[in-house]
Amino acid sequence: MSKESARAGRTAVRGSTTGRPLMAAMDLLGRRWALRILWELRDGPVGARALRDRCDGMSSSVLYDRLRELGDAALIEQTDTDAYALTATGAALGRALKPLDEWAGSWAAVREARAGTTRDGGR
């Protein structure tokens, strides 16, 4: 890989300096509200106002920053109706995250059972 292409890889995601695709993806997806926005778009296009309503507590400025970043990363695009939708790459990410969603459900059940055991004094 040339120095120029390595440099381009490092700047593909604002704030990511590793040049490694997985680390760049984690840097982007780790930003507040980024995954939530992608999750809300999983069933189809959603307008900015509806997205903000679905993501309680997110400010308009953060929403538009994330929409721009996710668009720059080719994960979402704006439709002809000014809604936002996943690109093919964004939809592929959604499919890749499905096992994590399933794991999170199991993990929540374990945590809930553990909390119940703790409240019962271990009984």
What are the residue ranges of the model-derived segments?
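Basic, amphipathic "hinge/linker" alpha-helix immediately C-terminal to the N-terminal HTH DNA-binding motif
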Residues: 79-101
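N-terminal helix-turn-helix DNA-binding core of bacterial DNA-binding proteins
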Residues: 15-64, 68, 73-75, 84-91, ...
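Amphipathic alpha-helical dimerization/coiled-coil segments
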Residues: 2-9, 19-21, 94-123
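A short, hydrophobic secondary-structure junction motif
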Residues: 74-79, 123
